[in-house]
Regions:
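Polyanion-binding surface elements
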Residues: 1-26
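Short alpha-helical DNA-recognition segment
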Residues: 22-36
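Short helix-start
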Residues: 32-58
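A short, Lys/Arg-enriched interface patch at domain edges and termini
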Residues: 49-80
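Low-complexity intrinsically disordered segments
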Residues: 76, 81-147
Length: 147
């Protein structure tokens, strides 16, 4: 699996390096088996595409006023967990893929089919925040293709 150095990850996500380092130091973002940790002998840390997307979603949610701990946990629901019809770290093939933060602190990834509205899918549930994963993923993939 391809990984990217810290500078590329920061640039692709629009996350300042100091903010990215803070996410890691405070364990908001933790490296997973698909990432490459630094061995401390001058080797760079390697971020997988999934981790870069988690960082980008975390940064986007932080811009919306969500705290980094909750933002990173919510982003992990998209980047590292799949749903029926959606592989891990990928968008639903049709419609919109939304990351929804619920008032109880949990987060879910939902699909809004092309013929439905968000109110049809959320029904009586209320949301603390909603983030369009498609927008964030497209931005990250475009930036990574330029690196």
């Amino acid at each position: 699996m391809q990984t990217y150095p810290t500078g590329v990850a920061a640039k692709a996500t629009g996350t300042p390096l100091t903010t990215l380092q803070r996410y890691l130091q405070r364990s908001h973002i933790t490296l997973q088996p698909c990432d490459v940790p630094s061995r401390g002998c001058g080797e760079n840390r390697g971020y997988s595409q999934r981790r870069i997307i988690q960082i980008a979603l975390t940064t986007e949610l932080a811009r919306l006023g969500i705290g980094p701990s909750r933002a990173a946990k919510a982003a992990f629901e998209f980047s590292d967990k799949g749903n029926t019809g959606r592989p891990v770290g990928e968008l639903y093939p049709l419609g919109q893929t939304l990351l929804v933060g619920l008032p109880d602190g949990k987060s879910v990834v939902i699909n809004i089919p092309p013929d439905k509205s968000i109110s049809d899918v959320l029904s009586n549930d209320s949301a603390a925040f909603i983030c369009d994963c498609g927008y964030v993923v497209a931005k990250v993939l475009s930036n990574l293709s330029k690196s």
